[in-house]
Amino acid sequence: MNIEKALMNYYELTLASYEDSTNRYHYRIVQHLIKGLKYIKVKKLEKVDITIGYKLIDYLKNHTHNGNNSIKKIINYLRKVMQHYRITTSIIDLPHLPNDTKPFERFYHDDLELIMTYTKNLNSSKNSITYKSFIRLLLDSGLRVSEALNIKISDMDFKNKVIRVLSSKTRKQRYAPFSSFSLKYIKELIEVNPKRDYLFYNFIKDRQTNKNDIKLFYKRLKKHLNLERIHTHRFRKTFASILIENGLNIDDLQKIFDHSRIETTIKYVQHNEKRALQEYKKYNDWGLN
């Protein structure tokens, strides 16, 4: 089977399963694979084995700007294509590259207070209202960035304090919670222009807020507050960790996140060592003499 044709066919087949931003990312992966496999002179998908896998990794390291984490995603995409066409070779035995980036850490109280105070004191411009409500809702709901940006005003259920969400990963519908912590700011944002479709809106550019807008705002936060690696995933980890610290059952958190495996949910929960040692003292009664 011709590699370029197989890759493009699989990409087109899966378009409906993902949102636009993910499809654009997958397209870049496909282009890397087409160029890399052409460079190492492999034309047939059936010829892609563990040796070709090593050569492809070498190409990606030396001819692109991809790090280990990105290369792993490219290789995994190739494996999915081969699996789709029921082609099994020794590439399944190709070892995983080590991670070359640190995982995102949760925010702790001092940093959260800095962020919330800064956003609360933003000016009264329409875009400032967008950003302050966005930050509040991230912490209050644990949403992924794509899920939050795609919320429509009609998705908000203020009576039950839930949001109808289309999962950016599974494409399934679920409901995410929110509370009075973000309610006031969301209502303020809607009142600015209640006739638009999407909740988060770039009023300067007259369009839906996008990921690049959020990245630019995070850079602004980082500069003004001197904080490292501000990212939506850190708010998601903070959401999970604080809820568990406050007594939420891990099974309930799994349902909120709509994870199929509880092991995935556990990865989001992060405590500091001091707190863990203090909590140990509350429960270390073994009932023995």
Curated annotation (Swiss-Prot):
* GO process terms (BP): DNA integration; DNA recombination; establishment of integrated proviral latency; symbiont entry into host cell; viral genome integration into host DNA
User: In terms of domain of life, where is this protein from?
Assistant: Viruses
Q: Does the entry annotate any disulfide bonds, and if so which pairs? A: none
Entries under Pfam families matching the protein: Phage_integrase
Alphabetically list the UniProt keywords: DNA integration, DNA recombination, DNA-binding, Hydrolase, Transferase, Viral genome integration, Virus entry into host cell
Core-binding (CB) domain: from which residue to which, for each copy? 1-86
Kindly give the InterPro entries that the UniProt entry links to this protein.
CB, DNA_brk_join_enz, Integrase-like_cat_sf, Integrase_catalytic, Tyrosine_recombinase_XerCD
Q: Which residues cross the membrane?
A: none
Q: Tyr recombinase domain: which residues?
A: 102-281
Instruction: Give the enzyme's EC designation.
Output: 2.7.7.-, 3.1.-.-
Q: Recall the GO molecular function terms of this protein's record.
A: DNA binding; hydrolase activity; transferase activity
Active-site residues from the entry: R144, K169, H233, R236, H259, Y268 (o-(3'-phospho-dna)-tyrosine intermediate)
Instruction: Quote the PANTHER family the UniProt record gives.
Output: INTEGRASE_RECOMBINASE PROTEIN MJ0367-RELATED (PTHR30349:SF41), PHAGE INTEGRASE-RELATED (PTHR30349)
Q: Which family does it belong to?
A: Belongs to the 'phage' integrase family.
Q: What does this protein do?
A: May function as an integrase.
What's the protein here called?
A: Probable integrase/recombinase
